[in-house]
């Protein structure tokens, strides 16, 4: 499973959301979770202070990384997905969402999220599997 920063942040804040609950279950059951670098960056940039940054970094470095087979192709795929969304009349709030979606597509893993944009992206990219919560 690929977990978007929106689900991680809800989990870390202790927010009671479907995605945060599903992530807590996945962690407790040691389900395989791959961490794309872009998700790591999005989580770390929200650290409250230097100490929190270091604690988050240490915790997240224990997760297996998602490593794209070809980073340039991943970037191209994300740009193309973003453009396809725009052509369909929907502009994602962040290009990072398309990059994260393409990580899930390449990994052939479902995406856990707390971000409505992924629902719209999945309507355009039918092979994007979202974790049901």
Q: What is each residue range found by the language model?
A:
Residues 101, 105-133:
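Acidic, PIN/NYN-like endoribonuclease modules and their adjacent C-terminal/linker elements
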Residues 8-9, 40-43, 118:
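A generic structural signal for short hydrophobic patches within well-formed alpha-helices
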Residues 65-112:
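Active-site neighborhoods of divalent-metal-dependent phosphate/nucleic-acid chemistry enzymes
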Residues 5, 37, 96-98:
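Conserved glycosyltransferase catalytic-site signature
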Residues 1-35, 45-58:
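Short, well-structured N-terminal submotif of metal-dependent ribonuclease cores
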Residues 51-71:
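Active-site-proximal, substrate-binding regions of enzyme catalytic domains
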